[in-house]
Amino acid sequence: MRKELCRNFQRGSCRYGENCRFLHPQQAKPNNPFGFGTQNQQQQQQQQQQNSSNPFGFGVQSGGSSRPNQFQNTWSRTASTPTGGGAAASTQQTGKQTQPADHKCTDPAACKRVMQDDFKNERPMWKLTCYGHWKYFPCDVTGDISYEELRAVAYEEAKRGIPLQSIVERERNLQNSKIAEFENFLRNPYKGSVTANQSPFAATTPSIFPQSSQINSPSPAFSGFNQQTAFSNTNAGGLSSSGPPNAFASFNQQTTFPNTNAGGVSSSGPPNPFASFTQQSNNQQTAFSNTNAGGLSSSGPPNAFASFNKQPNAFSVNTPQPVPSGPSGFQTNPSTTFKPASFGPGPGFATTPQNNNIFGQSTPTPATNTSQNNQTAFNFNVPVASFTAPAINTTNTSSGTELQIGGDPVDSSIWLKEKWNPGEIPEQAPPDAFV
């Protein structure tokens, strides 16, 4: 007994479902949900196999087996040199090993090969573009113009009445100039760039120590090794001096600082406030004048930086030129000349009975020898009470360390010691020079 089809089921409004007395035919869903195209049974089976093996629904499968690494990108550019041009740095596939592009920008030859390979294999169809041979470097060829911009300019020129032939000629010249720019860069890729062995500042700045001989004086103040300075051979007072005294060693070079006497004046100028550097000893020029223990020169003015025991300068080789003696510039009656402490127990301030002043005396009186003068003992190890303290007479003996207090000579070496041994502590009060 055949049942009739349920009309309500065909309309989609049957309320009985499976309990309905009429037939509810089961319609097979079409394989093509869009309703176009035909598929046979074999194609349906293949589609089912693909749906089971490939859930993404694309790719060709054979025999129901999945292909390994089906999403792996195995594309590689076949080139002899690594890439580095307008495209991003790609990787080369060798089997299953991926190697990054080896681009050595420090090697000009390698960079040029990369550029040649880029121009050969990756030259774009649109010529009005820019180019950079390395990913993170600035563009080597700049000035890119898009075709939209070129078209917009052509429209604007056409609106202004410019002939079409002129517009085309301008665009052709623009393209030819860009091609020429690329070719020039390929021939000379590093024009205008700074290499590792080239300084960006090509112009050399003049040195204050010129190599050419500018001054005839051969003695330097500090060792200059055959170099001459740009300073003139003058003294500190601005007056020229033709003498070649050396301040701190000489290797037959030009002085770094002006060649002067210590007073800053020439040999015929006013008195020298700090004595002269140009005293001679053993036929050699010394950096400091030869003085006795009192710090006064026997043949010249008082020297603030006196050499001791008449020892010549070990670095001096120049022939000395004696400078006329001059008294100390900072003097009163009696005047005290500032002198550094000696290596021995000698005094540092010397009192000379002179009345010369640096500001009014035209003819200096030469300083007398310390064997005929009394000096004030002073040492830098103790503080200075006053520069105007009353002078204490000293007697220049073999040791040079005796003071006369109340007419009696007193050994002053005991006051120069840093540490006293038992039994050496003096009973009397220290002299004013050591207070």
UniProtKB/Swiss-Prot annotation:
Assembly mode: Part of the nuclear pore complex (NPC). The NPC has an eight-fold symmetrical structure comprising a central transport channel and two rings, the cytoplasmic and nuclear rings, to which eight filaments are attached. The cytoplasmic filaments have loose ends, while the nuclear filaments are joined in a distal ring, forming a nuclear basket. NPCs are highly dynamic in configuration and composition, and can be devided in 3 subcomplexes, the NUP62 subcomplex, the NUP107-160 subcomplex and the NUP93 subcomplex, containing approximately 30 different nucleoporin proteins.
Stretches the record annotates as 6 X 2 AA repeats of F-G: 2-88
Keywords recorded for this protein, A-Z: DNA-binding, Metal-binding, mRNA transport, Nuclear pore complex, Nucleus, Protein transport, Repeat, Translocation, Transport, Zinc, Zinc-finger
GO biological process, one term: protein transport
GO CC terms in record: nuclear envelope; nuclear pore
Low complexity bias spans: 39-51, 78-99
Position of the signal peptide: none
Protein name: Zinc finger CCCH domain-containing protein 16
Molecular functions (GO terms): DNA binding; zinc ion binding
Keyword DNA-binding: yes
Zinc finger motifs (C3H1-type), residue ranges: 1-27
Domain notes: Contains FG repeats mediating the translocation through the NPC by interacting with transport factors.
Subcellular location: Nucleus envelope; Nucleus, Nuclear pore complex
Sequence repeat windows: 34-35, 36-37, 56-57, 58-59, 343-344, 359-360
Residue spans of biased composition, Polar residues class: 63-77, 205-320, 328-339, 351-374
Organism of this sequence: Arabidopsis thaliana
Name of encoding gene: CG1
